[in-house]
Amino acid sequence: AYRKPPFNGSIF
């Protein structure tokens, strides 16, 4: 997670 995505723990 770069900038707190909708899915916690995912890279978007």
Swiss-Prot record:
Its main location: secreted. GO terms for cellular component: extracellular region. It comes from the Eukaryota. The modification Phenylalanine amide is found at F12. Keywords: Amidation, Neuropeptide, Secreted. GO terms for biological process: neuropeptide signaling pathway. It comes from Delia radicum (Cabbage root fly). This is SIFamide-related peptide. Belongs to the FARP (FMRFamide related peptide) family. It is found in: Secreted. Expressed in the CNS and midgut but not in the ring gland, thoracic perisymapthetic organs (tPSO) or abdominal perisymapthetic organs (aPSO) (at protein level).
